[in-house]
């Protein structure tokens, strides 16, 4: 393998923004935000909109709990239904 062309693979914590569910895994993603995990170590924190804890396929719920989109925010702001 060539040296210096592969991304760094480290442990990171992913957090679901809608349910606040967190899990520790390995990834090449990095972040300036960190969190202290249950083992006492500090890891980079990656926020995600959807994870297995909130996706309808994994939860069995038909309603999708996602953050409001642009159209929804516009309609709320200007009172449209």
From Swiss-Prot:
Q: Note whether Translocase occurs among the keywords.
A: no
State the superkingdom.
Bacteria
* Record's keyword terms, sorted: Ribonucleoprotein, Ribosomal protein
Instruction: Offer a single GO CC term for the protein.
Output: ribonucleoprotein complex
Q: Which GO terms describe its molecular function?
A: structural constituent of ribosome
Q: List, in alphabetical order, the GO biological process terms annotated in this UniProt record.
A: translation
Write out the similarity annotation: Belongs to the bacterial ribosomal protein bL31 family. Type B subfamily.
Matching NCBIfam families: L31 (TIGR00105), PRK01678.1 (NF002462)
**Quaternary structure per UniProt?**
Part of the 50S ribosomal subunit.
Q: What is this protein called?
A: Large ribosomal subunit protein bL31B
């Amino acid at each position: 393998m060539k040296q210096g062309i592969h991304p760094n693979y480290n442990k990171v914590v992913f957090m679901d923004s809608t349910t606040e569910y967190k899990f520790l895994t390995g990834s090449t993603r990095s972040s300036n935000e960190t969190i202290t995990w249950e083992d006492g170590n500090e890891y980079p924190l990656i926020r995600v909109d959807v994870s297995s804890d909130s996706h309808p396929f994994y939860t069995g719920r038909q309603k999708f709990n996602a953050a409001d989109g642009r159209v929804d925010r516009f309609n709320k702001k200007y009172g449209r239904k």
